[in-house]
Amino acid sequence: MKRQAKPPEKKTKRTTNASSPTPSSSSPSLSSLPDEIVENCLARISRSYYPTLSIVSKSFRSIISSTELYVARSHLRNTEECVYVCLSDKSFEFPKWFTLWVNPNQANSMVEKKRKKKKTIGKLLVPIPSSNLSPVSKSAIAVGSEIYVIGGKVDGALSSAVRILDCRSNTWRDAPSMTVARKRPFICLYDGKIYVIGGYNKLSESEPWAEVFDIKTQTWECLSDPGTEIRNCTIYRIAEIEGKIHFGYTQKTYAYDPKQGEWECCEGEVAFPRSQCVMESVLYTFANNYTWEDDYGCKWWSTDGYGEKVKGLESLLEIHKRNGGSSDNTTKLVACGGKLLLLWEGYMKHNPNNRKKIWCAVIALEKRDGGKVWGIVEWVDVVHIVPTSCKLLHCLVVSV
């Protein structure tokens, strides 16, 4: 039966190319090529096309989900940055992860298209397989092409688990667990290591208050005891500043010096923006507090620590304010592909279905007027609709 069915298939293919001068001039289908050649072709195009190509055939889907494809992309130096978003809600059995899909055919400016069509066509949150072992954790960090989810809660109990999301294949695996279970540890990446501090209410002095994970060797090492004052300190933020791990809050900060292995109290105030990112060695921050007009919005920071507002974003800030972005602290600012991305939870005034919107804006930057930084809003729209109880937990950028 298979031999009899084969000739009609070939005949059908020739019929579709009847307009060609000769049968030999018809182009072969990409799916008819060996997997190695298909893999090489797919490695040369933007990852934005992969969701569409993955539904062409099982063979394409298998190649697109393989790690070999991303090894080929790396060899071709065709890696690109992608945004991963995590949403958490009591109605979810586990936190849900998404990729921010960018329409490769969208125009440079989506603002005009938005006026013509209400339907989102530029960017969407596309779900990826969730881990049924992943804890509900507010501590996650991107390292290259992977995302580390550290600590949190599993079935209401504190967890020492570390789960890794490989963003090349969107698959999960376990990393070695921490030495201590932590609810919400504060984490910071520096020099190939993840520093983890605090994250629980009570702990005996014999148990490590802080530890560090070596990404290369995949091993944990406990840090020296910081003393009673630091153990009991209030921590709102953590950041690496000039080779030291700073943590605390604006009025009172501490630091750990990895080179000396010492803890210290810091003099003066250290600003810990709620949302920040670095692009081309420039720090950008976003503050939600619109009560003080100077603090509300996006700033860029010079090397001498002076912050100045990114100009030209007034219309975006109005949209952000009007759609609930300034009412909470969930706004996320990330740098991706040489542009700034702003994501936030938007609350609806008339909301009979108890739903809210996740908004996204894409901002291109350019320098004008003697070094002033201006933002050009290329696109702003809703990328997802969720229950009002849902939280925008993480927004991270990986390189794949």
Swiss-Prot record:
- The yes or no answer to whether the keyword Plastid is present is no
Output the Gene3D superfamilies linked to this UniProt entry: Kelch-type beta propeller
Give the keywords, sorted.
Kelch repeat, Repeat
InterPro entries of this UniProt entry?
F-box-like_dom_sf, F-box/kelch-repeat_ARATH, F-box_dom, Kelch-typ_b-propeller, Kelch_1
Q: Where is the signal peptide?
A: none
Mark the Kelch repeats by their residue spans: 146-192, 194-240, 242-284
The domain of life for this entry's organism is Eukaryota
- List all Basic and acidic residues biased stretches: 1-10
Key word Repeat present in the record? yes
Q: In which residue ranges is the amino acid composition biased (Low complexity)?
A: 19-33
For region Disordered, the annotated ranges are 1-33
Question: Residue limits of the F-box domain?
Answer: 27-73
Q: Which Pfam families match?
A: F-box, Kelch_FKB95
Known CDD domains for this protein? F-box_AtAFR-like
Protein name in the entry: F-box/kelch-repeat protein At4g19870
